[in-house]
Amino acid sequence: MALNQQDVARIARLARIELTPEQQSRAQDELNGILHLIERLQAVDTQGVEPLAHPLSAHEDIPLRLRQDAVTETASAERRAELLANAPEQSAGLFLVPKVIE
């Protein structure tokens, strides 16, 4: 599969990215290179290959570094106030951002 200029223009429009003709041409080359690599990876026979939890786990005994999914306070009240001072808009200790999705 290869992308043409129209495909790249459509992807850029969907991503709300404005590209010059030069950037569009470069993006087309890069995306086609990525798609070619994916095709090569898909062509590899992986029947009988055990899945890995970590890419190095086949060579080393690496424990999985998982943590509990729990809410924690990561910054002190002073640090939070310092960080929020950089926000153009804030409310109730949260950053306010403009709507970006229609």
UniProtKB/Swiss-Prot annotation:
SUPFAM superfamilies named in the record: Glu-tRNAGln amidotransferase C subunit
Lyase listed as a keyword: no
Pfam family, one: GatC
Keywords recorded for this protein, A-Z: ATP-binding, Ligase, Nucleotide-binding, Protein biosynthesis
An individual GO BP term: translation
Enzyme Commission code(s) on record: 6.3.5.-
Reactions catalysed, as given in the entry: L-glutamyl-tRNA(Gln) + L-glutamine + ATP + H2O = L-glutaminyl-tRNA(Gln) + L-glutamate + ADP + phosphate + H(+); L-aspartyl-tRNA(Asn) + L-glutamine + ATP + H2O = L-asparaginyl-tRNA(Asn) + L-glutamate + ADP + phosphate + 2 H(+)
GO molecular function terms noted in the UniProt entry: asparaginyl-tRNA synthase (glutamine-hydrolyzing) activity; ATP binding; glutaminyl-tRNA synthase (glutamine-hydrolyzing) activity
Protein family per UniProt: Belongs to the GatC family.
Record function comment: Allows the formation of correctly charged Asn-tRNA(Asn) or Gln-tRNA(Gln) through the transamidation of misacylated Asp-tRNA(Asn) or Glu-tRNA(Gln) in organisms which lack either or both of asparaginyl-tRNA or glutaminyl-tRNA synthetases. The reaction takes place in the presence of glutamine and ATP through an activated phospho-Asp-tRNA(Asn) or phospho-Glu-tRNA(Gln).
HAMAP family: GatC
Self-association state and partner proteins as the record states: Heterotrimer of A, B and C subunits.
Protein name: Aspartyl/glutamyl-tRNA(Asn/Gln) amidotransferase subunit C
Biological source species: Bordetella avium (strain 197N)
